[in-house]
A protein has these predicted regions:
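Feature marking well-ordered beta-strand scaffolds used for ligand recognition
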Residues: 1-268
Length: 268
């Protein structure tokens, strides 16, 4: 691997980076900007060797943006962990807010949003995952009029990320929900104990979603993950990177079934 270019922005933390499917536009999140405006930055990555900042967008995002998602001509940006705004980028030099989604309840919080086939999967901690129509048509929603139509939550209240996944081997569709738990709190100067696992949920009946399987690595909690060609790649904090075979029907405890096919302990 070799670095071929870079950009420098005013931020204490860039927590998320997403690139459009056509590979032309990158959006990054900002927290802790000295200007206190935070927001997002759009970058032209058409030529990865000569990347250029196109614009920044800060309206309603000054509290900090932890996660973003880019889908076609819209960006979905979390605002201060309370809601997400939908921003049109038909003209990336002049982004425009067109919509917003939040739960209509006191104390709600959001950690992540992922869009697939016109559905936004909103990860809302103790409130679980919300399925929101932002253009699919299943509930009459659009980017400018997000409409919630499904929800699943569970006892730990630690839902922080969602990955919609269709099995190549069976054609079945799963909504994979990840926990993020620190049983003894967070020590920024040391190694932390983590817990939690991945929940595989069948939303075939949106009014009665069913959790059918899990991947739980004893002694370690989950964080980010990716699924490709029925292979799960999941970061498990001190448990390193775990690689899991998801082919065939998914039922029960996938770890105990011996589906793990590889791992990399990145901290050693």
């Amino acid at each position: 691997l070799k670095k071929i270019d870079s950009v420098q922005v005013d931020a204490r933390t860039v927590n998320d980076v997403k690139v459009s499917k056509d590979g032309k536009i990158c959006v990054i999140s900002r927290e802790g900007a000295s200007s206190r405006k935070n927001g997002i930055i759009l970058i032209d990555v058409t030529n990865p060797k000569e990347v250029k900042i196109i614009s920044e967008y800060t309206k309603n995002l000054t509290g900090g943006v932890h996660n973003v998602f880019i889908d076609k001509n819209h960006i979905y940006a979390l605002s201060n962990a309370e809601r997400y705004y939908v921003i049109n980028i038909d003209d990336p030099k002049n982004p425009k807010e067109v919509g917003m989604f939040e739960l209509d309840k006191e104390g709600q919080s959001i950690h992540d949003v992922w869009i697939e086939n016109g559905i936004a999967y909103s990860s809302n901690w103790s409130d679980g995952v919300y399925l929101v129509d932002v253009g699919n048509g299943v509930a009459g929603g659009s980017p400018s009029n997000p409409v919630s139509f499904g929800n699943y939550s569970y006892a730990s209240g630690a839902h922080h990320a969602t990955f919609p996944y269709k099995s190549k081997s069976t054609g079945k569709f799963y909504t994979v929900l990840g926990d993020e738990i620190f049983p003894n709190g967070v020590n920024p100067k040391g190694t932390n104990e983590t817990a939690g696992f991945l929940h595989f949920v069948d939303f075939s009946d949106v009014n009665n979603p069913i959790e059918v399987a899990r991947y739980e690595l004893p002694g370690h909690g989950s964080h980010n993950y990716w699924i490709e060609d029925d292979i799960l790649y999941v970061a498990m904090y001190t448990g390193g990177l775990r690689i899991v075979d998801l082919s065939g029907d998914l039922l029960g405890d996938l770890y105990k079934q011996g589906r793990e096919i590889g791992y990399l302990l990145t901290g050693t």
